Structure formats: structure tokens, C-alpha cells
């Protein structure tokens, strides 16, 4: 956001007490750290050494900053996440102020593909959520007593759970060729269950969760879905808090696939088929994305890791960056800008704003930590993607 003049509340109060009329230009306060309507987004490169907010508040840097293209240890990337959670929350505090001790928390991760299913199913760095970030997020939640039940959920278009297929591996049990130090989701849940017996940890395939048929809250956008009704997993409908956790990734149909587009994974394959072609019959992907997002807009969103994916999906980008905040559209706006995209040309951003889920104007987003320009690393755009006509915010 552009630097704005921040009024000293004490001075204003003193002037009011003295009976002085406040100048009109001072009445037109735009955005301050004390106004929650301005979304805050934490931006943390692995090289982050500290910064200063627009109101003069200091933000301490990472204890062990590293180059943005260096392979990171688990401890280093987890420190990045903790910093992003700290500075990307609300005025009242970070993620720990959003989630209550007795909440049912769903972490919607992104595991579209699965390493080890066959000779063609290899892990492409950046194509799935970094498991070390998931691990660090759960450790944060458990350590701050945020959540009584924590569910890691995904509904992949490509793989099914082992118990429903003949495959020896699935997205929950894959160790991704050692990319995350031998970590798998199954191991992760087992370890946390042993350490925190008072919390229920679980894995859930949204493709086979119980569903309800529900109209889209507000107006449905998908033009081939005149009734505006979707099958919605009960887990998504009934959980108290939902965190969308996705890599920085391009997509041939939507330009980028970040925390809002992560909601394509909630459309159950048991109802829409594999690879969920039934969803795409209901309308354009951007429309379906925002329809699905409407059922339970993310309470918090986290993007990035060590790797992302550019172009049409096969080319990895090494860029150590984590972006986090309580408004998913604001987080995606910063993420898209960091990838070299114009947020005004992403159609599902436009649609999400139209439905009241926030805005995509960088000038109206309080970025904390690294500046967006400093975090920018242009990603190659998908060959067939057509930017939407840019609209004014």
C-alpha cells in the first residue's frame, strides 16, 4: 500500500478536548493499524532482516536469514511461518487471536498430485503444499491451544485413498521422494496425536466426505448452474475455522491457483467425478471457485514455501517466500503481485470482490515484513491463459 499519513490519536483527543475543530483533511483518515477494515498481510522472505511499519512500529527480522534461493532447513522455513503468522493477523494479534481453544479447525491443504503412484507421478517441487509448513502450522496451533480438533483435508482430482484404490501409496502416505525429510501427512498426524493427546488430529479426503446439497450463499456465479446448488462436504460446512494453505502456483485456466482457488478441492469427486469434470460443466473455473469459496470463506490463508510452479505447471521456481493473513483475497492479491501478475486481471479476484470477500487493490492492503517489490520474482505465465480486462478498484 502507499504510505499514508497516520494521525496521532493522542493529539486528536487533546485537540477535541480543547474545543478545537478538527481540520477536514484530518477527518478523512484512510487506513491505520488500528482499523481492522484494512487487511494486514505478512510477507516474509527467507532473507528478512526486519522492517518498519507505516506507523513507525518495528518488525524484528528472522534470527537466521538466508538467501531466497537457498535450500532451507526445517527450522528455517518454520521460523518464516511463525513470523508470517505473527505479523499477518489482525490488529488484536496474530492467528492465535482468531482461533479459540475449543474450535474445530480444518486445514485445507493442496495435494493435487501424488508422488509414487506410477512412473509419471513424480514430485514437482512447488506443485503441492510444503509439508514442513503444515507441520509448523499445526505445532503453532497446538502450542497456543488453538483448536480442540484439527483436520487436514483435501479432495484431489488425481489420487484416491489407498483403501479405495489398488495403489500402495496415496497423498496421505507419500513421502514425496524425501523432499520434506521423509515427512508424510500420516506420520505427521501420528506424531502430533502422541504429543498432544487432548487434541483430535485427523486426515480427511473431501472427495468421500458426507455431503449436503446447498444453494450458494448470496448469488451463484456459475452460469450453467441455474439452481445455484452444489454438493458441499459436511466438514467444510460444519467446522468452526478454515485455514487455506497453498503453494505459489500458476494455472492454465485461472492464471494463478492460490488460497481462494484452493477451494476447487472441496468439490467432492464422489459427486463430480474424477478429475472433477462435473464441476467444470457448471460454469467457468473462476466462477466455480468463488461459488465454492462462498460456503465457508477462509478464516486465514497462507501461501508459499520454498518452491512454486510457473508456466503450464511443470517448471519449478525456487523462491523462499511465505505470505499470510486473515483475508484470503488480500493474501492472494499480494501473492499474485509477488509472482509478477497484475491482480486486477485475475477474474476470480474480481468476482470475489464483487461478492464482498475483500479487495484486490494493493494500495488498500497493509503489507508487513518485506515490501511486495522486494518479494517479487516474476513467474512465467501459462501459455493459454487470457488475462481478464483490468477493472478499477
Segments and roles (model prediction):
Residues 3-393:
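N-terminal and secondary-structure boundary signal
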